[in-house]
């Protein structure tokens, strides 16, 4: 019996150690890939695929919003985009940037095929993403009152984003 308890304790300890190592590695990778926001980005007017104006300062006023850089060619985005869509369905303000994913019609076709309805700014040449120094897709920035308060790169989940949004709303 004592041997079984000892084995359970060691397994739990190993799980905790490996979990903490994973979290620390994830934080280090996010720090390394940290985007840098362009000057006066919050006041810029962007136009989505439907030619509707989008201003980050307005979208992030009083509540955090997601700025989501993705690509139709990105394998990790195929797992992250449904979480972003679910947050959009939950009434979270979302603005996305389709990085080098084709012309506006190709991006619209991809969105229809995948049943995504979040607003998309097309970045066919990568100029917008370059101005943010985006190094990986997906990259998600959480912006509140026109200021970047959190960011993450790579694979993420609905609940991971939900917790980040909640923490951002506390500030």
Predicted regions and their residues:
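Short, small/polar residue-rich loop motifs at catalytic or cofactor-binding pockets
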Residues: 40, 63, 135-137
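Loop/turn elements at helix/coil->beta-strand transitions in domains of secreted/extracellular proteins
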Residues: 62-64, 90-93, 118
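Hydrophobic beta-strand anchors of alpha/beta hydrolase catalytic cores
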Residues: 66-67, 94, 140
């Amino acid at each position: 019996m004592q041997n079984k308890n000892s084995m359970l304790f060691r397994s739990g300890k190993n799980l905790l150690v490996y979990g903490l190592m994973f979290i620390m590695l994830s934080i280090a990778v996010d720090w390394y890939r940290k985007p840098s926001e362009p000057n006066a980005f919050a006041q810029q007017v962007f136009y989505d695929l439907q030619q509707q104006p989008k201003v980050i300062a307005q979208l992030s006023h009083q509540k955090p919003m997601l700025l989501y850089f993705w690509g139709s060619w990105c394998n990790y985005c195929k797992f992250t985009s449904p979480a972003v869509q679910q947050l959009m369905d939950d009434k979270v303000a979302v603005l996305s940037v389709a990085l080098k994913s084709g012309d506006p019609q190709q991006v619209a076709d991809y969105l229809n095929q995948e049943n995504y309805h979040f607003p998309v700014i097309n970045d066919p040449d990568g100029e917008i993403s370059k101005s943010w120094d985006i190094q990986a897709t997906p990259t998600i920035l959480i912006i509140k009152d026109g200021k970047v308060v959190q960011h993450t790169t790579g694979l993420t989940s609905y609940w991971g984003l939900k917790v980040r949004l909640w923490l951002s709303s506390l500030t």
